[in-house]
């Protein structure tokens, strides 16, 4: 199937063909990938908590030290096109996951609507509903489960 030249880049390019800027722009800014997750030892299901990484701004859902995040948070996960087969743990609304699955971006995504606030206004992000990992002991994270990764 031919895709028109004027189609958005995420519909006409493979993940590997994206520039670094195009790749980064797929991020909708929801911050969900920066929430602490727990894995069920019985069935390996991944559950999101409302506990945010210490670097995540709880209102803007942006990393407060993006350039140095790996030095400050050694287990921070770097999303790359080469790891697309591992994106199943990302929310079903995630731009990276959607594009890797050959799906289009939702109407509220900033690349579609031009408004980076829509991710918050549509309540896709957890803006204002998260707790910092500084404020919750790791033993209590299970008390803050919000959804299961699909």
From Swiss-Prot:
InterPro entries the UniProt entry points to: Puta_zinc/iron-chelating_dom, UCP006173
Domain of life: Bacteria
One Pfam family, short name: CxxCxxCC
Family: Belongs to the UPF0260 family.
Cited NCBIfam families: PRK05170.1-5 (NF003501), PRK05170.1-6 (NF003502), PRK05170.2-5 (NF003507)
Classification via PANTHER family: UPF0260 PROTEIN YCGN (PTHR37421:SF1)
Protein name: UPF0260 protein PP_4587
Naturally occurring in which organism (per UniProt): Pseudomonas putida (strain ATCC 47054 / DSM 6125 / CFBP 8728 / NCIMB 11950 / KT2440)
Highest classification ranks of the organism: Bacteria, Pseudomonadati, Pseudomonadota, Gammaproteobacteria, Pseudomonadales
């Amino acid at each position: 199937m031919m895709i028109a030249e004027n189609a958005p880049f995420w519909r006409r390019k493979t993940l590997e063909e994206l520039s670094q800027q195009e790749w980064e722009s797929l991020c909708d800014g929801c911050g969900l990938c920066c929430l602490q997750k727990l894995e069920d030892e019985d069935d390996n299901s991944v559950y999101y908590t409302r506990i945010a990484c210490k670097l995540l701004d709880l209102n803007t859902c942006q990393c407060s030290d993006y350039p140095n995040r790996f030095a400050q948070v050694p287990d921070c996960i770097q999303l790359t096109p080469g790891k697309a087969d591992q994106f199943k743990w990302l929310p079903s609304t995630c731009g990276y996951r959607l594009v890797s699955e050959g799906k289009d971006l939702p109407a509220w995504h900033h690349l579609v609507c031009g408004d980076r606030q829509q991710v918050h206004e549509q309540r896709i992000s957890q803006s204002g509903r998260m707790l910092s990992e500084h404020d919750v002991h790791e033993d209590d994270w299970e008390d803050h489960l919000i959804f299961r990764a699909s």
